[in-house]
Amino acid sequence: MSFFPELYFNVDNGYLEGLVRGLKAGVLSQADYLNLVQCETLEDLKLHLQSTDYGNFLANEASPLTVSVIDDKLKEKMVVEFRHMRNHAYEPLASFLDFITYSYMIDNVILLITGTLHQRSIAELVPKCHPLGSFEQMEAVNIAQTPAELYNAILVDTPLAAFFQDCISEQDLDEMNIEIIRNTLYKAYLESFYKFCTLLGGTTADAMCPILEFEADRRAFIITINSFGTELSKEDRAKLFPHCGRLYPEGLAQLARADDYEQVKNVADYYPEYKLLFEGAGSNPGDKTLEDRFFEHEVKLNKLAFLNQFHFGVFYAFVKLKEQECRNIVWIAECIAQRHRAKIDNYIPIF
């Protein structure tokens, strides 16, 4: 039986894989986007979305509709779909789905700490957190003054505790330390998720490893570019690079020595797919940003996950494609609301 994993994959996971493939069929097409960008008002946008799989998800919202309400409802719909899958998942799929939520938990913790640093009330901040990364202790984050307090009082009983070992210090939480904590948590998270996927092996590893390798490398590039002109030393910068990407080890060593954007671009030149991304990015009006090029490549990798069956990668890919779809709809909605149509086509097409 071990020679035919698909025979027993469907016993525990067949229903959910069928479900996620059905949900993926409802991802907006290019024709849908062409309709959305022609909308004159957010009410028009709502009507067009009703003709898609989103249906009446905005039916109970009073006029005038706002972009923030659309954003909240998009996230809410995605979370309902995800939690349905999580509630019906057996191990090891249950743990795999939990791993997907950890990145949102990290983002929520950082958002709460940063907001508290700027004297924002916790009641104002919690609604801004992503519902996929919510956890019981979230509202107590504002009591922590140092990373050690943050860990001991709040995060020790959450899944993030395992990723926090390299962040514990008695230094005060300031802007620089918060960014270091964010990137250290993401490094530990990505390396742990990568290890989990390699242990699962098979088609899941084949689908997930390239996706996580790209995510690790993207973070290394962005950390390097964002560190220019800051107080972050090259040694500290190197400690933040995830070690599960294709850049490890030679590319990361070169990034650690980089002094400007051109030197980062030179590192990318050694990796054909990254070279293409950097060459396609520019800072002139009408050019795509490097971030957009990264998003496009991420969409491409996630679409590839659906080409094979009997693996968990489709669940991760679906969440990431829906996340990009939410960004696209919110971008179009913002352009309509602000009557700034010149850049309305700057969304990332999926299908």
UniProtKB/Swiss-Prot annotation:
The modification Phosphotyrosine is found at Y270. Keywords: Cilium biogenesis/degradation, Cytoplasmic vesicle, Hydrogen ion transport, Ion transport, Lysosome, Membrane, Phosphoprotein, Transport. Its main location: membrane. Ubiquitous. It comes from the Eukaryota. One of its GO terms (molecular function) is proton-transporting ATPase activity, rotational mechanism. GO terms for cellular component: apical plasma membrane; axon terminus; centrosome; clathrin-coated vesicle membrane; early endosome; lysosomal membrane; proton-transporting V-type ATPase complex; proton-transporting V-type ATPase, V0 domain. It is a peripheral membrane protein. The modification Phosphoserine is found at S283. Belongs to the V-ATPase V0D/AC39 subunit family. V-ATPase is a heteromultimeric enzyme made up of two complexes: the ATP-hydrolytic V1 complex and the proton translocation V0 complex. The V1 complex consists of three catalytic AB heterodimers that form a heterohexamer, three peripheral stalks each consisting of EG heterodimers, one central rotor including subunits D and F, and the regulatory subunits C and H. The proton translocation complex V0 consists of the proton transport subunit a, a ring of proteolipid subunits c9c'', rotary subunit d, subunits e and f, and the accessory subunits ATP6AP1/Ac45 and ATP6AP2/PRR. PANTHER family: VACUOLAR ATP SYNTHASE SUBUNIT AC39. This is V-type proton ATPase subunit d 1. The lineage of its organism: Eukaryota, Metazoa, Chordata, Craniata, Vertebrata. The gene is Atp6v0d1.
